[in-house]
Amino acid sequence: KKSCHTGWLKSAGMLIPMGYLIGNGYAEVIGDPTEIDSLEATVYGFFSEDSSIPRGCSPYSSYKGAMRCMMEGAGDIALIKDTVYDSYCTGSDAHDWCLDRDEVVMLEPFGQAPSHPALYNPENMDLETISLQEALGALNEDQEGADILWDLLYTKDMIPTNAQDHLGTYGAAVSNVPGIQADFG
């Protein structure tokens, strides 16, 4: 089967699914398990040499592009977020390349990429950082603040958390990707 990925080393379209497949014994790492470039050979070995792994801008990069890749027949499976179909293939803005909902099979989600957090080091907290953190948290308190968060950050709220809770199962799945610890650990 030919796979359509959102891009090289992208969370939902590459790291989570491949980490899941490797970690659960479905896919075997091809190449040096300490080298991130082995991931490409692993994808091609598990799926197909004709799989789409965009690097940079192409019609098949991003969530929309990976779905389009599958729907136009360039691939057999799109590795995307579960919300992508509704974002691009429903309503008056649906793209002409979209298949009808009953023509696609959507699997149950098996992992989730963490949101894009605002990070700070608690050991280096100065008054300016504390003020910023409090201001961001206060935006959750009313509709005007929620509108600001949506307009600026495309999120509906800011939730205080720690790295371990925030990463959840993502860290476990991604740790199975060859070379991830050496390159990013």
Put a short name on every predicted segment:
Residues I30-I53, T90-Q133, K156-D157:
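Periplasmic-binding protein-like
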Residues K2-T6, D76-I80, L119:
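Structural recognition of the beta-strand scaffold that forms the well-ordered cores
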Residues P17, T83, P114-P117:
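Proline-rich low-complexity regions
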Residues W8-A12, T83-D86, E123-D126:
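Solvent-exposed loop/turn segments at secondary-structure junctions
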Residues W8, G111, A163:
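Residues that form or immediately flank small-molecule/cofactor binding pockets and catalytic motifs
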Residues I22-G23, Y63-R101:
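A ligand-binding cleft/hinge motif common to bilobed small-molecule-binding domains
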Residues K1-M67, E72, D147, L152-P160:
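Bilobed "Venus flytrap"/periplasmic-binding protein-like clamshell domains
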Residues Y120, N124-G185:
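An extracytoplasmic/periplasmic, membrane-proximal ligand-sensing/linker region
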